């Protein structure tokens, strides 16, 4: 069948896209796009990576932590794919819900979307085991106690906050826990990639580069 979208083009099998559970999970992603950020973009392969990682992490001790949950695309797909509300785990979704923290010299590319915190609360008020936490990272991590992590998504579009989160959370990640770095291999994100490479080299880990631009690390 082949696939050409979201920075990749491949003739590899896309059979996973026909899976009924995956279709339902991706439908949840589209429902979450209330501000139109995703629009007509096709991120199915990226979501495939997310739900694969979540499925692995389901059987590892620890909670799910989403640093830069944005509009809730990853979270909503995971909730549907794993029936997360039935699990003995908590999903922590952190975001400013208004874009990048300009203290680090970043341009806020999400400024035109305003503050979407209430949108996320309203869209996901029926989900069990979900904690939606508003604030800039890594500072906001100090407001909660998380003992063990099996799944960590890092998508802050900014070097310093991402490395700050990893410094705080690394020791809490269980053996075999999965880390997804959303921007790792994307064009224009070399500063993030280089910083992540340095961090994970210090932990004797190698980041796997996905054709989607995501990076994957297993602790």
Locate the predicted segments by residue.
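S-adenosylmethionine/decaboxylated-SAM
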Residues: 8, 13-41, 51, 58-219
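N-terminal pre-P-loop "Q-motif" helix
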Residues: 45-49
């Amino acid at each position: 069948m082949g696939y050409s979208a979201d920075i990749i083009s491949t003739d590899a099998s896309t059979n996973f896209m026909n899976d009924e559970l995956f279709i339902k999970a991706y439908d949840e992603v589209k429902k979450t796009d209330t501000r139109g950020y995703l629009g007509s973009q096709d991120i199915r392969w990226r979501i495939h990576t997310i739900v694969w990682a979540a499925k692995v992490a389901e059987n590892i001790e620890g909670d799910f932590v989403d640093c830069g949950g944005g509009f809730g695309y990853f979270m909503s797909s995971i909730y549907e794919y794993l029936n997360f509300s039935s699990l003995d785990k908590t999903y922590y979704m952190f975001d400013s819900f208004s874009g990048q923290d300009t203290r680090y010299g970043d341009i806020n590319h999400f400024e035109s979307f305003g503050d979407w915190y209430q949108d996320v609360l309203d869209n996901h008020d029926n989900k069990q085991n979900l904690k939606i936490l508003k604030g800039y990272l890594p500072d906001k991590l100090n407001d909660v106690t998380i003992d063990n992590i099996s799944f960590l998504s890092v998508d802050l579009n900014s070097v310093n906050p991402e490395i700050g989160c990893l410094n705080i959370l690394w020791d809490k990640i269980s053996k075999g826990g999965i880390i997804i770095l959303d921007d790792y291999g994307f064009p224009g994100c070399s500063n993030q990639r280089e910083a992540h490479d340095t961090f994970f080299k210090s932990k004797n880990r190698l980041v796997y580069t996905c054709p989607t631009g995501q990076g994957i690390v297993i602790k």
